[in-house]
A protein has these predicted regions:
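Short, acidic/polar
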Residues: 50-66, 93, 137-147, 218-230, ...
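Short hydrophobic-acidic sequence motifs that mark active-site Asp/Glu residues
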Residues: 46, 157, 239
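Bacterial Sec-dependent N-terminal signal peptides
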Residues: 1-24
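Acidic-and-aromatic substrate-binding clefts and catalytic sites of carbohydrate-active enzymes
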Residues: 48-58, 78-91, 165-166, 213-222, ...
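Short helix-terminating capping/connector loops at secondary-structure junctions
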Residues: 40-41, 102, 153, 235-236
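Substrate-binding cleft and catalytic face of glycoside hydrolase catalytic domains
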Residues: 32-33, 65-83, 92-215
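Aromatic- and acid-rich polysaccharide-binding/catalytic face
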Residues: 68-72, 162, 201-211, 223-250, ...
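Boundary/entry segment of secreted carbohydrate-active catalytic domains
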Residues: 24-69, 73
Length: 262
């Protein structure tokens, strides 16, 4: 991880050089290789994109040069793809998926189940009452499998469930998971079911649990414990997605290393 963070700092330094050199008379050539080329023997380099990023010529050129994987920022989330039960809107997600197909860029699917940006029809009835577990599971299965099946030719991995672990100190007697409507209906089991439904739709896709503040020691341990329980229960989970909301003030590199090493 130290190598990854330091490489990002070096990249910023590299791009600062042309802006300074342009004050002189020398002409600085446009780079042809990007970060994806520098790290091709180690890992993929990705970015979060929206529809504007993949339709603007300058941004397209940058994406194609620097990245070999992209993630849809919002276009594949539950609310944008199925705002009402059975009424799908594929326009933005299709645009990003087609961009990846044309340019040979891999696509990370984000996200199939999240307490935010999700239609309330998924978990409650017209009167605002929570659905039974059976009805909720039926809605969730239909949604997940429709989305995964549509993009299985281009999406190589999915963030199946997003941000289900509670933040901060957990009070005695309270669950370690976020008390979302989905959790209130089915408890931790809804996470397991989401992964099962995604795996049924695309057995070849890598499936991840995704969250933020992963470098905070107490939360990283809760995330680790959740995924450990999932693995022990036979749930098809392949890894943990760590949202990199990092800046010069934090988190501490030692905490990031510790989270990865759990």
């Amino acid at each position: 991880m130290k190598r990854i963070i330091l490489s990002g700092m070096c990249a910023l330094m590299f791009w600062a050089v042309p802006s300074l050199a342009q004050r002189g008379s020398r002409e600085i050539p446009t780079p042809t290789d990007g970060l994806k080329d520098a790290y091709k023997d180690y890992f993929m380099i990705g970015a979060s994109v929206n529809t504007m990023n993949v339709t603007d010529a300058d941004q397209i050129a940058l994406i194609k040069r620097e990245f070999n994987s992209i993630t849809a920022e919002n276009a594949m989330k539950p609310q944008p793809t199925e705002p009402q039960k059975g009424e799908f809107n594929w326009e933005d997600a299709d645009l990003i998926a087609d961009f990846c197909r044309r340019n040979g860029i891999r696509l990370r699917g984000h996200t199939l189940m999240w307490h935010s940006q999700i239609g309330s029809w998924m978990y409650q009835d017209e009167k605002g009452n929570l659905l039974s577990k059976e009805k909720f599971y039926d809605n969730m299965k239909h949604h997940i499998q429709a989305v995964v099946s549509r993009y299985k030719d281009v999406v190589y991995c999915w963030d199946v469930v997003n941000e289900a672990v509670a933040d901060g100190p957990v009070r005695p007697g309270r669950p370690e998971l976020r008390e979302s409507p989905m959790y209130k209906i089915a408890g931790e089991e809804f996470i397991y079911k989401a992964f099962e439904y995604a795996h049924e739709a695309d057995p070849d896709a890598l499936l991840f649990y995704n969250d933020y503040n992963d470098a905070e020691p107490a939360k990283s341990q809760r995330i680790f414990n959740l995924v450990k329980r999932m693995r022990e229960a036979g749930v098809p989970v392949d890894g943990i997605g760590m949202q990199g909301h990092y800046n010069i003030y934090g988190p501490e590199m030692s905490d990031v290393d510790a989270a990865i090493s759990l």
